[in-house]
Amino acid sequence: MKLYGGFGSPFTRRVGVTLQLYKLEHEHIVLRGSVPEELERLQKFNPLGRVPALETDDGRALADSATILDYLDQLAGPEKSLTPASGDARTEVMNIIGISAGAVEKSISCYLSLIHI
């Protein structure tokens, strides 16, 4: 597998941490959508040009950290998965993840507006 994105992105970082926790062999390739020279290559894996993106061993491209984490949970199997497989426990975990991801996105947006990007 290949993980595309810089660890300056909290979303790339959460995928990288999960890959390490699951002990899944992967290559990390630093690509940033904010760098014009890297954007075109990144768009091959995520048409939106956002990180992270994951290229699976069979060549599929996955975009968005939530989608990638769901894929990694499936690879890890039910015994190792960080997310419950079903039921109320899964719903509660997914809700917490959604709120957390939204808070991070809002923080990044506020930061970027302060530095006028």
Predicted features along the sequence, with ranges:
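GST-like domain detector, emphasizing the conserved glutathione-binding G-site
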Residues: M1-I115
